[in-house]
Amino acid sequence: MLELDRRCDAADPDTLVLLTPHGIHVEGHFAVVVAGRMAGALDDTPNVALDVPVDRGLATATLAALHDAEIPAVGVSFGGNVPEDAVMPMDWGTLIPLWYLGGRRDPPRSVVVVAPARDRPLAEHIAAGAAIASAAHRSGVRVGLVASADQAHTYRSDGPYGLSPRAAELDERIIRAVGEGRLQSLVDLDPTLVEEAKPDSVWQLLMLAGATGETWRPEIISFEVPTYFGMLCAAYSQH
């Protein structure tokens, strides 16, 4: 993550579009945060906390682009009924990447946070990624895209999801797909493999596939299994 932080600083985006598996879940819909800010802290670690502005202009444009692509999506907020003044709780899938990628800057980088829709077809996530990229291209600002995506969660028998040999099987396939620039191939994953390995990544990676198309070159930085789940860091640069 420190290397991704270095590269993000070098690219110096004005705002980050972040795809999180751990934000709000809306049945049958993708979700785009349209509150004025996001704030939160890690459980039991109150000193790891962030409060960042939402790029509401880009968030609104992203939502419109999803609608234009006929993808079911809703804008979501929290608390106050004036979206500009509302503060959306920040999930850990958002906080941890932002901790490294500009959330602690002064001022912090603004964000647009999008949640996938696991109950929608996998192929629709590719189309959603393309719509998100279209909105970013039209925005006139420098945008970085972050796919927050832990890998398989069944590496340890004492973990919350138990042990499955399919964890390594899935992650090996994902690593190859990322490294070879074939993220779209994940649309053909066996649902049983996904269920047994329990990744939090497939949906955001397919959105990343739609956003990057064939014009971005991947580079794997690291893959580790520090606990019961796998963690993959990769960076993309344009050809």
Mark where each language-model region is:
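Flexible, D/E/H-enriched segments
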Residues: 1-14, 25-126, 159-239
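Non-transmembrane, aqueous-exposed alpha-helical and coiled segments at domain scale
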Residues: 26, 130-139, 143
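Non-catalytic alpha-helical scaffold/packing segments enriched in small hydrophobic residues
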Residues: 124-131, 144-147, 173
